[in-house]
């Protein structure tokens, strides 16, 4: 599960530096000029909205033969981040061809018609340019990172890799072997194995059940011809999204895109809503492993980014995370790293994670903290503190062009449109204690637990009793 430790911020959703500066300046002016608290609140809200508008105005949206393009201008930036995103994610694949999109993108970044593998590596190394790929349940991407000075040449290589990959046998086998080795190692590491087991339980009957990364068996079965066919059916502008962040001119960029990606066929791909997850009862699956501690994770359904509930849910998850750390680690020393987490998927999840020798006592405490969050009054100062910390992490994480490109893509593909990425802060500031309690009651229930460890040491009743009962 993505970002389960919550020691990381949620998947690349941040504002630009200019946004941060504008808010800080507006707040300072407000505090200095308005003596009344109510007036300060009104001015702060107005300043934030103005900052949102200013940041959104840096984004230019345009269409090239059905390809949607988002360009975020960052004047003076010395780097450029580019992502060619493929819509669909797990919905593009089946049990039989899971992993083909990941392998296709990986092999494409190895060699292309005009840049065989050795030449591509030499050129990229000379410029310090990076081309890579990424896949998740909702979309995948071919990614480019370069300096502004080397963007022109880097763009040539990137577009050639995207549009004219050679898929030579030796290149495909190289990427294949790396992927297979990684997939076969999944069961060696308890944390990784825990995620694989959790996915089988949580996503049964759902499109997410077919992992975009595939399995060792499926990845090993693909041939270069399979990749060529999949590439041909995927490279349609209706299936793609291009996001670029850097100090670039939109007019010049349009010409470059028209002469490259703009020549692709449109196709007729139409995104469909993702089926939401539904857990009707708490469950527990225990896998025997001779380990010094038990590895435990539990999932509950969570609101998607398009839901108004996502904002109080972020606060609720953060409060729970902090309370678990205090109660489980600091006060009782039951575990080194208890955590609560919240995802950013179209069919979203949240959950608990812990490693503990005394699994039963640890889970009593953790489920007790969920119950407390659901039923005891929450201090408004706690909510404000969490939001303030979130803002700090938010802005720090927004410092790179790659993070901003990822944020725009996430909200465009999963969050109801890229403009919503600029409204997160104000939505969070509007969260009240009652909202936090409400979403905790609504979503933090029917938890599906997976445990790796000693089945004899696990009290099933503790894990499957509903929080709050």
Residue map of PLM features:
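C-terminal regions of mature proteins
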Residues: 39-51, 241-246, 353, 384-469
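Buried hydrophobic packing residues in well-ordered domains
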Residues: 66, 84, 101-104, 124, ...
